[in-house]
């Protein structure tokens, strides 16, 4: 009988620990949301941040992007489709987060391209050919310049800008903002300041749908 009482007591204790852990996690999540809501808008978007979609959109997706990240490559068409299907209601803001080896070269080239109005063609090329230059087991950032040649980029100017203090400072600013927002992996998504609670394609779509509904009274276009 005593053994049964001990086992029952242990089971109850485990249940209580589980309940406390669940409520504690929920409380921390809610607290984080409150803290993020109090962050200045500049931590989500900077004057240099590349954008895709209407500047008048009421819903803004901020993506912390690493061009060498395979998951970022997988999400790239999904996010652009969300923008295109929403007819001016959603805008994408890109932030540079070169966590992987070789990605620092890539984001410098991307920012140099942005200075020429060529961010999206160059980014598209780097994402498309990611396996060529950004493979985890053997990154080859030295191939990046040859890959983006032919996109219409002024190569001489881009090479100068990519190693400039201005570009370096902008990448460092994005990394500092990523740290401030607790971004530790890519892609990192925020929709109107709200982070994903769970990571996944459906979760991104659902969070955008909620914000579109809140702002416009209609969900994401199919």
Where are the language model's segments positioned?
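C-terminal cap of thioredoxin/glutaredoxin-like
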Residues: 1-23, 145-222
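A short beta-strand-turn-helix
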Residues: 42-59, 83-84
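Short clusters of hydrophobic/aromatic residues that line enzyme substrate/ligand-binding pockets
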Residues: 50-52, 133, 196
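Conserved strand-loop elements at the edges of beta-sheets that form or border functional pockets
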Residues: 54, 63, 198
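Structural alpha/beta surface segment adjacent to cysteine/selenocysteine redox centers
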Residues: 57-68, 73-149, 179-184, 209-222
């Amino acid at each position: 009988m005593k053994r049964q009482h001990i086992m029952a007591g242990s089971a109850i204790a485990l249940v209580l620990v589980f309940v406390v852990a669940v409520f504690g996690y929920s409380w921390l999540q809610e607290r984080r949301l409150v803290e993020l809501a109090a962050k200045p808008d500049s931590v989500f978007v900077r004057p240099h941040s590349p954008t895709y979609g209407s500047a008048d959109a009421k819903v803004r997706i901020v993506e912390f992007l690493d061009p060498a990240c395979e998951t970022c490559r997988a999400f790239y068409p999904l996010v652009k489709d969300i923008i295109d299907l929403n007819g001016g209601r959603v805008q994408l803001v890109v932030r540079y987060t070169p966590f992987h080896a070789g990605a620092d070269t890539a984001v410098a080239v991307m920012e140099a391209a942005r200075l020429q109005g060529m961010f999206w063609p160059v980014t598209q090329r780097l994402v498309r050919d990611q396996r060529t230059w950004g493979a985890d087991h053997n990154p080859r950032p030295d191939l990046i310049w040859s890959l983006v040649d032919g996109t219409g980029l002024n190569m001489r100017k881009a090479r100068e800008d990519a190693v400039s203090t201005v570009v370096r400072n902008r990448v460092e600013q994005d990394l500092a903002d990523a740290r401030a927002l607790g971004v530790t992996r890519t892609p990192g998504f925020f929709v109107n300041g709200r982070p994903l609670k769970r990571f996944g394609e459906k979760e991104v779509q659902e969070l955008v749908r909620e914000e579109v509904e809140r702002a416009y009274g209609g969900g994401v276009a199919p």
